Amino acid sequence: MEPVSIRTKNPGAMWPGPVATKFGSTEWIPCGGNNKCAVFSTFEQGAAAQFYLWATKYTQMTLADAIHKWSGHNSSPEYAAFMAKRIPSLTMDTVMTVAFLKSENGWRFMKAQSQWEAGKPYPMTDDQWRRGQEIAFGRAAIPPPPDIEPIPEPVPTKSIWQALIEFIISLFRRK
C-alpha cells in the first residue's frame, strides 16, 4: 500500500485545518498514532497548501527549528539533515524565508520534504511542484474540484390507473 502522504495527495502529510481547506481539502484520514492527514483532489493543491503553510508558519526560523516544529519533535535532527543534504545552499542555521520558498530551491525543498514524509521519492513531476508553488503564491489559480456527475432527481411514475384517469379526463376537456 502507498504511504498515506501519497494516497491523500498531501506531500507534507499536513494536518487538516484552515490552510488545507483554503487549498481544497474537504476531508481527512487517520495517518498513524493520533495523527490526521488532510486529503486533496490534486497533488498541486497539496503542494500549494504545503508551501503556504511554510510561508505563514515556518519562516523566520532556522531550518533546524522549523523542522523541529513541523515534525512534532519526531526525528527532527535526522529530518533536518536529510533536507540540508538535498539543498546545497541550506545549513541547519539557514533562516527560512518566503523569498527562499518562492525560489527554485523552494520547490526542491518541498520535493525533498515529501520524500522524507513518504519514505520514498514522491510521485510528482518538477512541473507539478512549480505549479503548486505558483498556486500558493498567487501566480496561478486554484484548480476547480473535479467534475462530479449530479445525481438525477427521481422521476415520479404514474400508476396505470392514474394514467388512465388522466387520459379520460383529457377527452372531456374543451379545446
Which ranges hold each PLM region?
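Cell-wall polysaccharide-cleaving catalytic domain and substrate-binding groove, primarily
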Residues: 1-175
